[in-house]
């Protein structure tokens, strides 16, 4: 069977990639990622039971989160690293099973018959006619890449035959991948929440359960949105407690004459470590793409060698990385297949990877040594200037709420007629130019609320301001869509409305990968309706599942700029 992947917006033909991913991943990489997800589901079968009896699940929790994150679009293209992850997962699964067996002796008693039944069931032992055999995901075994390949052939997306069940299982899985990305960043800053891990396990196990109906899976998908809100709130707390609340900031987009390091991705802990280790070395640091919002945090402003932002959204990196001249550190997705001209200047860390690119691992205490990339930078020329000037951002919820009287007054007086949430992702399809044209064509009495790399379609346009309020308010990274929800809920309270949908806010969201999925599910959980997704609806939504979203939540797509603006403004 050939590969099949339809998790991102660029799925070939709007249906799915079957030969090679549009993202660049090979058939082998795609299938190994399928197998990683299968291994994670097997681990969840055991870890959910280990958690229930009060034993430590931290190793499994960490592995599940990192593994889900490693399979996000454009995160990891390193076959060796991915196969090693499969191997590690099987060892963790066995250790969980051993823990259950060990615990069985003390829990297996006349006073605890329910545990006895559960204990036997989770080990795959049928002790009465109602017991189910344990799923293959919890018991299959192999120890080499060739056997992994054979197994991967049988566990991909299409292994679920029913189109609607498959669609719901994948929608849930992609939501979990986005959730894992945000949880990983919070964990890196020392913040965690057991209930989120417990839900992830429950949801993963549910995707293996053939007895669950479409309605039951739909309920789980919506519950995933609840935990999506929780994980974004946790990450917001982690980021702001550690680095301060983002504040209105003018960000330099030009260059200086020193050698530099370009840091891309989302991990603020990596950003902090890099800034600390480069201080006093003569090496400047620039952000790229989704790392732009690091410029908004007070804690990073003390570093004089932190210059600003270089370049645009992830998909332009081939030309921009080439022009930068210095080394590039990829902390998370999105990686585009590197050109030979800069591949030897590229470094990955965390769950990211690309074959032939140097990887920087963390030590046991979580610290990372960036000395190699710093020394590399010293041997390089300074960045080539590709643009100059400034852009403004830092409008996360704390900053916007500080401006609440000004914003509320502008709404009450009619100076601001409507807000447009245009958060989400950018991508290489030409149809995404719609979002630039949409921003340009919006009436002058409207304000754009954005987060994520979708901002690059319009954050360098001169759209002016309304009574001193910029018409583009950038909250930050894609996870900072949470800020936009907080702002909306506060406005609902201020205007004494019963329903969040009564606010003069429209949602025209550009999606690309799985973090956008968890953001969407979170918004649905908060009761937001009539969200428009583009440039196309996800390929993984079957007609029936799409119908559910349309009928219950008013989900729509985009048409033309003029037609859509007319529709939104009426």
From Swiss-Prot:
It is found in: Cytoplasm. Hybrid [4Fe-2O-2S] cluster binds at residues 266, 290, 334, 425, 453, 478, 513, 515. It comes from the Bacteria. It comes from Clostridium botulinum (strain Okra / Type B1). One of its GO terms (cellular component) is cytoplasm. Its cofactor is [4Fe-4S] cluster; hybrid [4Fe-2O-2S] cluster. This is Hydroxylamine reductase. Catalyzes the reduction of hydroxylamine to form NH(3) and H(2)O. Pfam families: Prismane (PF03063).
């Amino acid at each position: 069977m050939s590969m099949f992947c339809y998790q991102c917006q660029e799925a070939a033909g709007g249906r799915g990639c079957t030969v090679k991913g549009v993202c660049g991943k090979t058939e082998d990489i795609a299938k190994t990622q399928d197998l990683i997800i299968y291994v994670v589901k097997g681990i969840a079968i055991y870890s959910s039971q280990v958690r229930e009896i009060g034993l430590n699940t931290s190793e499994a929790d960490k592995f599940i989160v990192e593994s889900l994150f490693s399979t996000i679009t454009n995160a990891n293209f390193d076959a060796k690293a991915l196969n090693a992850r499969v191997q590690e997962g099987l060892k963790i699964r066995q250790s969980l099973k051993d823990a259950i067996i060990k615990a069985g002796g003390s829990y297996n008693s006349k006073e605890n018959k329910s545990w006895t039944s559960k204990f036997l069931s989770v080990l795959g032992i049928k002790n009465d006619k109602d017991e189910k055999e344990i799923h293959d995901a919890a018991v299959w075994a192999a120890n080499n890449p060739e056997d992994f390949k054979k197994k991967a052939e049988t566990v991909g997306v299409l292994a679920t035959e029913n189109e609607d069940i498959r669609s719901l299982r994948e929608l849930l899985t992609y939501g979990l991948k986005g959730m894992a990305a945000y949880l990983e960043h919070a964990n890196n800053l020392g913040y965690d929440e057991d209930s989120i891990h417990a839900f992830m396990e429950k949801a993963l196990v549910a995707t293996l359960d053939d007895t669950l109906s479409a309605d039951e899976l739909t309920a789980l998908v919506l519950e995933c949105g609840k935990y999506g809100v929780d994980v974004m709130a946790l990450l917001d707390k982690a980021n702001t407690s550690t680095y301060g609340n983002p504040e209105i900031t003018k960000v330099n987009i030009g260059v200086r004459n020193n050698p530099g390091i370009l840091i891309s991705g989302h991990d603020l802990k990596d950003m902090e470590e890099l800034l600390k280790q480069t201080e006093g070395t003569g090496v400047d640091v620039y952000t790229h793409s989704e790392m732009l919002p690091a410029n908004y945090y007070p804690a990073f402003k003390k570093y004089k060698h932190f210059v600003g932002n270089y370049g645009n959204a992830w998909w332009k990196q081939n030309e921009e990385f080439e022009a930068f001249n210095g080394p590039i550190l990829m902390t998370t997705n999105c990686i585009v297949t590197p050109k030979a001209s800069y591949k030897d200047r590229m470094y990955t860390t965390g769950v990211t990877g690309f074959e032939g690119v140097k990887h920087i691992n963390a030590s046991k205490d979580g610290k990372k040594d960036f000395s190699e990339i710093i020394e590399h930078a010293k041997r390089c020329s300074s960045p080539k200037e590709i643009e100059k000037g400034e852009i403004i951002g830092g409008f996360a919820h704390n900053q916007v709420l500080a401006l609440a009287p000004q914003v509320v007054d502008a709404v009450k007086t009619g100076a601001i007629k409507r807000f447009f949430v245009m958060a989400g992702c950018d991508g290489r399809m030409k149809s995404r130019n719609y979002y630039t044209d949409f921003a340009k064509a919006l009436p002058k009495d409207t304000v754009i609320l954005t987060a994520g790399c979708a901002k690059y379609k319009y954050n360098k346009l001169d759209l002016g301001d309304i009574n001193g309020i910029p018409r583009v308010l950038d909250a930050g990274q894609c996870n900072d869509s949470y800020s936009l929800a907080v702002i909306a809920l506060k406005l609902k309270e201020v205007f004494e409305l019963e329903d969040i949908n009564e606010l003069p806010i429209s949602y025209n969201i550009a999606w690309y990968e799985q973090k956008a999925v968890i953001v969407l599910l979170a918004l649905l959980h908060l009761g937001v309706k009539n969200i428009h997704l583009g440039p196309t609806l996800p390929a993984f939504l079957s007609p029936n599942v799409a119908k559910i979203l349309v009928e219950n939540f008013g989900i729509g797509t985009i048409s033309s700029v003029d037609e859509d603006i007319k529709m939104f403004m009426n």
